[in-house]
Amino acid sequence: MTRTKRLSAMLAAPMCLLTLAGVLPWQPALAEGAVQSVGQQHAFDFHFGTWRTHILRRASAQKWVKMTGTVIDQPLWGGRANLEKIEASGSGSHFQGLTLFLYDPKSGQWSQQFASSSDGIMDEPLYGRFANGRGVLYGWSGDGRKLLERDTWSDTTPSSYHFEIASSADGGKTWVKEFIAQLTRLEKVPDYDTPHTAGNGPEHDFDFNLGRWQTRIRAVLNPLSAPEVWTNFRGTHTVYRVWDDWADVGQLEVDGPSGHEEDMALRLYDRKTQQWRVYFANSASGTLEPPMIGRFKGGVGTFVFLDEIGGKTVLVRNVWSGITPKSCHQDWAISADGGKSWVPTWISTDTLGH
């Protein structure tokens, strides 16, 4: 069952607020006996902080490239998620990237997804868990030919750890190491909120939203059966840079009828297409939704994606408007007729300094 096919169960389950506007519910509460691991959800706690990394990256069958760089890992949601950013150089090359790690309380597993500054697109997720001090996640490689990928964390101490990426072309029977890194902790305060350079290009479209905002939300919990019933939420929306000109994160914490809720929006800029991709996640489900895609024009940002409701493909639209130095406005709506008419599902206003 897809997230939108659970539309009829919306009122019975908590909602992911940042994707509620697109009719995207939270995962239902865990049933008795489901996997719950307090230790597992803190498996990446060793990783938080700033690290020096020494990398060997395979360039060909017989050639390895050496690189050095910095890794900064930030805890989110009390350790149930973390955001890693890496910058490294060597042998005439340089790259920036970020990795989002999310803990799924239902499965008891972690997922990770990587994006490079070259295109701002999240790779397919890898899944796995830690056991006996060793973390192993599996998925598909993100470059070119699809190979099985295995990421491994080992030899973890308070001051160092080892990381490897390996690939397999035979379903996991044999593995070839592609990336080897040894990391040593740096005794410095992590630079989570990256200083940003002011600019007018499209990569700076979300600069207006940086900071800590008070937010008020009105949302329709079930736009098909009860489009006239609105529910109110209040809380904070904190937005900060991950990388200066291609990535930022918005963290939403609000209180509503179902209690306290935490959501995240990861916004990545694609320099090739000059578009933004906005990925959503919430702490209850620990999964990353497919992105909305769009751009700003004339001070208005419009983002859309396709979803299914009742077996029909529908459009979901998010519009940013009314942008001033101290406030901004969002409207969300869904359309079942290709955009001819829209059913509003979300209205929010962020206010700075109140």
Predicted features and spans:
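Intrinsically disordered/low-complexity terminal segments and short unstructured peptides
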Residues: 1-3, 18, 49, 173
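Bacterial N-terminal signal peptides that target proteins for export
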Residues: 2-16
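A general, composition-driven signal for non-globular sequence regions
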Residues: 8, 21-22, 261
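C-terminal segment of classical bacterial N-terminal signal peptides
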Residues: 18-28
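Hydrophobic small-molecule pocket/channel-lining residues, especially in calycin-type beta-barrels
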Residues: 30-354
